[in-house]
Amino acid sequence: MKKLQKGVRDILVVFALQVAWCKIIFFALFLLIGLECEPTSNITLSKFFLACVFAPVWEEIAFRYIPLTIAIRYFKKSFIQITIGSAIFFGYIHGSPINIMIQGVWGLMFSIIYIRNGLVYAIASHALWNFYCLTQ
């Protein structure tokens, strides 16, 4: 039960940090370059499944479970570099240069959850974040 409480607490803390970070970054972009966004509409079941189930499972396995498990077992001295590299690559696959920074930070946060609590909690945190983004 304590592990569940710790995992849920970590997910909520990371989620709060993500929302705050995102609001600060996008508010700054709105002010600096006049960036505007439109509310999301027409969320289909397939879009929901892709964003909130498939992507979190696949990305957490590909960017956290595989590289960090290998790093822990075989490359302990390079663990931090591998974690940062994985987070940067995670950001890179999400597109634009601004996404490399934003998603890279999320990758580091998901890595912390993975290391502290395990894969299921990292997937849950990632799914929660994607759900939040999908519904904004």
Describe the function of each predicted region:
Residues 1-55, 61, 68-74:
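Juxtamembrane helix-loop-helix connectors linking adjacent transmembrane helices
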Residues 45-136:
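Transmembrane helix-loop-helix hairpins at the membrane interface
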